[in-house]
Amino acid sequence: MREIVHLQTGQCGNQIGAAFWQTISGEHGVDGAGYYNGSLDIQLERMNVYFNEAAEKKYVPRAVLVDLEPGTMDSVRAGPFGQLFRPDNFVFVQSGAGNTWAKGHYTEGSELVDQVIDVVRREAERCDCLQGFQIIHSLGGGTGAGMGTLLISKIREEFPDRMMATFSSVVPSPKVSDTVVEPYNATLSNHQLVENSDETFCIDNEALYDICMRTLKLSEPSYGDLNHLVSAVMSGVTTCLRFPGQLNSDLRKLAVNMVPFPRLHFFMVGFAPLTSRGAYSFRVVTVPELTQKMYDPKNMMCLLDFRNGRYLTASAIFRGKVSMKEVEDQMRNVQNKNHTYFVEWIPNNVQTALCSIPPRGLKMSSTFVENSTAIQELFKRVGDQFTAMFRRKAFLHWYTGEGMDEMEFTEAESNMNDLVSEYQQYQDASISEGEDEYFDYAWAM
C-alpha cells in the first residue's frame, strides 16, 4: 500500500488534526478505540494509507503529534478519539515558543526536533511503501510555523524522494489574530514552504470566520466550528488517497496534475454544501448546484476572488451517488461559461474524480482544489503587513535575540515578492510563451 505519515504541530495543527482524524475514522468505520465496526468493503480497501493495523485488529493512525507545550496534547488525549493514537507518538516539552518563529525554528524547536524525527522514522519503517508526508500547522504562531517548517526541512533531508503535502493556516487575520508578530511568522514560514513543500493547501482564518457567520449564521464561531470546516475540506481532499479510484490516487499524481511549475504549489480549497457542526443537510443537493458552488468565492477557504486571477489547474472530487456523465456535462458547462478565467496554454486543466462514499450526514458533496494565480493577493496581504513592521524594525529584537539575522527577514520578503511576480507572470502569459515553459518543465519531470 502507498502509506502517508501524518504530522500535526502546534496548537492549531493539533486541534485541526484531532478533528481530521475524528472525521476520517468515522468515514472508514473505525470507532474511538480503533476497532472497525463498518459494513462496507470499500472502507477497508485502502485503510492502510492512513492507519496501521496493530494487534487484535486495532487500527492506529500513522500520526505524530508535536507541540512545545502540553496543553493541547492533554486536550487531544482527553477528546473522544484520544485513545486512537499511539502513546509514544505524542512528542512535547514544557517550554512553549511564545508565538515567536525563531524559538520554534532555532532554539526550543531545534532541541526537540531529533526526538520527533526518531518517531517519524519509526512510523516510516512500519510502512511497506511510503508515498510521503502530510503536515498540519498554522503559519502565524511559534510552534506550528517555526518548528513545523523546521520539521519539513529535516524530513526533506532524510526522505528526499518522498512527497510533502502541507495543510497550512496561511494568512494572519485581524479577526482571529492572537499575536502582533503573525506577519513575520507567516512570511518566514512561506519562505520555507516555497522551497520544501510539494503541495500546500492554503486555509485562511478570515474566510473560515466569514463562512461561519454569513453562510452558517453562527453569531460567535468557536475554534471548534472553524476546525469542523477544515476537517471537512481535508476529508474531501484526501478522499482519492483513502478510497479506490483512478484520479489523483496518490500525492505524486496529485502534484503532477496540479503543479505546472515547482514553486507554484499553493492551492485554494473549497467545499459544498457547507453545514455547521452536528447539523445535517436536509435539503436535496444536485450536481448542477455543487458545480456552481465550486466557482463561488463564498465556498472557498481563502478570502480571495478567483475573478482577479486565472486558473492554472483545478481538480474536483464529487462524493455520493452521482452520475459520471452528469458531472462531466456540468463541469464542461461551467468551464465553457468561465473559460476566460482558465489559462489556455494548459489544455485539459480541470480534473474530476468520483467516490461513492459521501461524508457523514450528507447525501452528496464536492471538494475542489484550485491552483489559481489569484492566490498572489493572499501573499500580498501578508507581505504588506510584514513590510510595514519590518521597515521600522518593530519587534525584531524577539527574533534577533534567538540568534536570527536581519538578512533572513530580507530574504524571506524578497522570496515572497518573487512568488507574487511569478504568479502574475503566468497570469499574463499568452499561449505561445506559456506553452514553451510548461512543456520544458513537463519534459524535465
Curated annotation (Swiss-Prot):
Cofactor: Mg(2+)
Annotated positions binding GTP: 11, 69, 138, 142-144, 205, 227
Broad class of where this protein is predominantly found: cytoplasm
CC per GO annotation: cytoplasm; microtubule
Keywords: Cytoplasm, Cytoskeleton, GTP-binding, Magnesium, Metal-binding, Microtubule, Nucleotide-binding
One term of GO molecular function: GTPase activity
Tagged with keyword Hydrolase: no
Subcellular location: Cytoplasm, Cytoskeleton
Parts of the chain that traverse the membrane: none
Residues involved in Mg(2+) binding: 69
Taxonomy, superkingdom: Eukaryota
Pfam families to which the protein is assigned, alphabetical: Tubulin, Tubulin_C
Entry function: Tubulin is the major constituent of microtubules, a cylinder consisting of laterally associated linear protofilaments composed of alpha- and beta-tubulin heterodimers. Microtubules grow by the addition of GTP-tubulin dimers to the microtubule end, where a stabilizing cap forms. Below the cap, tubulin dimers are in GDP-bound state, owing to GTPase activity of alpha-tubulin.
Family as reported in the entry's similarity comment: Belongs to the tubulin family.
Known partners and oligomeric status: Dimer of alpha and beta chains. A typical microtubule is a hollow water-filled tube with an outer diameter of 25 nm and an inner diameter of 15 nM. Alpha-beta heterodimers associate head-to-tail to form protofilaments running lengthwise along the microtubule wall with the beta-tubulin subunit facing the microtubule plus end conferring a structural polarity. Microtubules usually have 13 protofilaments but different protofilament numbers can be found in some organisms and specialized cells.
Name of the molecule in the record: Tubulin beta chain
Organism annotation: Ajellomyces capsulatus (Darling's disease fungus)
Source species taxonomy: Eukaryota, Fungi, Dikarya, Ascomycota, Pezizomycotina
